[in-house]
Amino acid sequence: MNPARRGPTRVAARKGAASAPAPLDEQAPQAGHYAELLRRMLPKQSQTVASHRLGNERVWLKKAGPRHGQWRYRVLALIAGALRLDVLRPVPNPGGSEAILIEARRLRELGEAGLRVPVVLAEQPGGLLMSDLGQGRATVSVLERLEQAAAAGPASLLAAWRDGLDAIAAVHARGAYLSQAFDRNLVHCPDGVIGYIDFEDDPGMALGLAECQVRDWLSYLHSTAMLVRAAAPQAAAEHWHAVQADASDAVRERIAHAAQRMRWLRHLPSGRRWGRDTQRVRASARLLNRWYSR
């Protein structure tokens, strides 16, 4: 769980070079020849994720990256161990071809559950070709929507935040779970539906369904707590508990338990020199303490 990583190696709503279709220096295959495009472009692509044109269709090619080091998970791993909360324990991203296989499998599973995720068009060892969530039109992540809404005031921010809550609840209502349910990985599509991206790891390989769903809620809160706490923490509680009312008893009990275990984290230092992850953990703990105080 590392929401600090917001670089251009994601599948949708990107800024910079990865947002524009990568130029092809050869004639594109006929529309529908996804496997051929993947075979041709995978060895040429330097970016981890880049978009391409296949006829009139925009597609995304994701190639295997290096195995991710454990250091990036150190803050939450230490906290999870100290609190004895498995739901907070990071699920390491294996990187490489293994992560590609996991992502392809999870995209298919979630798609079959009726959720809006990129369609797997073709795959081979070390590479994956996916559809564009916007079908060629612009998409906006919940992260971007929150940042825009924050400037408009608390009411706008809460509305944007609730969209993310509802999107996660829709996944859970189908008996499913996400992976890294951070605001950057929830994507507003042009038709108004929120889609989901980034499935290089699978918490379900180590945890039960209830724990995976609790991770989704805490991941989203972790990535948004600083904005929410600064704007309207009490009003946000009403949205939070309204959505949680439809969660299973097991999920609600585990969230309340996590809130109690995390209480002391509200006293973590607030200075920026301690890092953004520490600030987010502190903000999350303060919100949960306020929302679940007895």
Describe every region a protein language model picked out.
Residues 81-82, 94-100, 108-111, 115-160:
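Conserved structural core of kinase catalytic domains
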Residues 66, 135, 194, 201-205:
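Activation segment
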Residues 2-48:
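Juxta-kinase regulatory segment immediately upstream of eukaryotic protein kinase catalytic domains
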Residues 189, 199-294:
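C-lobe/activation-segment region of protein kinase-like
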